[in-house]
Amino acid sequence: MSNIRPLHDRVVIRRVEEETKTAGGILLPGSAAEKPAQGEVIAVGNGQITENGVRALDVKAGDKVLFGTYAGTTVKVNGEEFLIMKESDILAVLEG
């Protein structure tokens, strides 16, 4: 993992690569394959600052999460691509 530390209520996510083949075996060109909306949390910020103090985040490093296809900002660090997004852009945590 590269040295990247998100601030406040932001999280760093590594996308999980999606299949480039359909269930029927048809290969999808790069432009037709949608970006995956699933990834692994790599790092989390300290929490959201509220009037009552800081609220800790519900996700933690290592969680597998679902997020909107266009959520977050893509950044490249040491040649590796990550997404930085607010915790509120995460739709669900995959358990099990």
Swiss-Prot record:
InterPro entries cross-referenced by the UniProt entry: Chaperonin_GroES, Chaperonin_GroES_sf, Chaprnonin_Cpn10_CS, GroES-like_sf
Q: What CDD domains does the entry give?
A: cpn10
PROSITE patterns from the entry? CHAPERONINS_CPN10 (PS00681)
Disulfide bond sites: none
Which Pfam families does the record associate with it?
Cpn10
Q: What is this protein called?
A: Co-chaperonin GroES
Enumerate the subcellular locations listed in this protein's record, separating them with semicolons. Answer: Cytoplasm
**Has UniProt tagged this entry with the keyword Cytoplasm?**
yes
Asked if Transcription is a keyword of the record, the answer is no
Q: Which GO terms describe its molecular function?
A: ATP binding; metal ion binding; protein folding chaperone; protein-folding chaperone binding; unfolded protein binding
Cited function: Together with the chaperonin GroEL, plays an essential role in assisting protein folding. The GroEL-GroES system forms a nano-cage that allows encapsulation of the non-native substrate proteins and provides a physical environment optimized to promote and accelerate protein folding. GroES binds to the apical surface of the GroEL ring, thereby capping the opening of the GroEL channel.
Q: Which domain of life is it from?
A: Bacteria
Q: Which SMART domains does the entry mention?
A: Cpn10
Q: Name one GO biological process term.
A: chaperone cofactor-dependent protein refolding
Q: Which UniProt keywords apply?
A: Chaperone, Cytoplasm
Q: What is its main location?
A: cytoplasm
Q: Which GO terms describe its cellular component?
A: cytoplasm
State the family it belongs to.
Belongs to the GroES chaperonin family.
Q: What interactions and quaternary structure are annotated?
A: Heptamer of 7 subunits arranged in a ring. Interacts with the chaperonin GroEL.
